[in-house]
């Protein structure tokens, strides 16, 4: 099943800002021809900062306390950012509303996409918490952090995931452990969180995300590998290049059924990781 998503404007904090920015956006375009790239970058960057500030105000005013409330706040925020950055997307398959979701990982936009389509809980490496903007956003939304090699980290992650499952929220994680540049559909999967999900007897659905540049950006020499997928650049350097894009379209595919792990995978986490990776890659074909 395909579902075309047009991120509609929601009410509440930020509605006036949407109108102001949309008017400015129209002023920056003349008969379909965008203005110079530096101006677009400044406009988009200012818009993103404003959206972030509005989300902060909403968080202070509403003070979400439960994990479900925080996940709902993050979902609204991510939908606004995607709309504000002219990122459209469609969803193929039924959206998982519970259990675990394993996905490929290309860029920080993956997080926005997974959250925008419905509230969810993320499991992420501890380094994300130290990342400007994204770290604060993830912490306030109830993200479960995993510190590799730290004593008790696996137990804490399992406990956090269990709370998400009990709250009826889908728990999303990226087993690659880092972002790739798209040279392969999915890099090797780490086995820890997959094994914990199996031990908790929770279902696990595969997801695959891909991106498509606009014809204008392709003509301008932009590439997914350099301008969308997040490789070795610093976050700020990559963001500055990204905000110069005209538009971007994403597709997120979900498997129709949960992953059916073999008996061997149930008893061997490495085999389980390989089977989960195969399920994700199958969605790229």
Which residues does each PLM region occupy?
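Catalytic core of membrane glycerolipid acyltransferases/transacylases, capturing the structured
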Residues: 52-64, 84, 99-151
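Soluble extracytoplasmic domains of inner/organellar membrane proteins
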Residues: 154, 161-165, 169-189, 194
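A transmembrane-helix-recognition feature enriched in membrane-embedded lipid enzymes
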Residues: 23-91, 136-141
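Residue-level preference for the first positions of well-ordered beta-strands
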Residues: 98-100, 168-174, 203
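Soluble, non-transmembrane catalytic domains of enzymes that act on hydrophobic metabolites at membranes
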Residues: 2-29, 84-94, 167, 182, ...
